[in-house]
Amino acid sequence: MIINEIEIETPFGLMNTFITRPDENGPFPVVLFLMDAPGKREELHDMASRVATSGYYVMLPNLYYRRTRNFVFEPTPLGREKMLAQMASLTNDLAVQDCQELIKYADADPYTNKGPVGCVGYCMSGPFAISAASALPNRIKAAASIHGVNLLTDKDDSPHRKANQITAEIYFAMAEKDKWADPTMVRALDEHLKSVGTNFRIEWYADTDHGFVFPNRGAFYDKPAAEKHFERILSLFDRNIKRTTT
């Protein structure tokens, strides 16, 4: 595997980004791997690398780059307060702009195939992935939200509002015990996406809680469910961004 830490020049500053890909048999389809609230870290590097081993050029950006290059979450009340402040600095529109910058960079790299792009967002980035799919329908052809939050809200930028523009296949992995994504919201999301003709699947992961895919999340980590999520997203990418370019 090839691993690089690079800085992408954007109109908003330098976006430090972890990039990983196989060392043979390229060029590769691009996958945007969007972090959860605790930020870009080694745990996510490992997860992104897991995806890359299946034949993808995976980009994991620090979405907090406008405020800090290296955010380190501390599991204390003050640490949580700092994390929430970082989260509040982001919007769906800003995340879409970042995805555009990532794709622009990837298109200039000879190891990418310049074809359909995949995107996966975790927790706070679930809506970012869906928003990117609606804003960039000509490029993003597969998107996944893993225990995502704020997928359907009353705000003007709620990701469901432009779902009719999505051309990608969408996958939602929902944690059964997730207090941040209650069943009422998910049912409303399901009904709305059906009404606009989105190609999607919502899957509930039984007896799991928010953050179940992360190995360092202690009791919240559910290895069988985490492995299933990898199976689902890799299958999603295979159908939509790999097979169409080989």
Stretches with model-predicted labels:
Residues 1-246:
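N-terminal cap/leader regions of alpha/beta-hydrolase-fold enzymes
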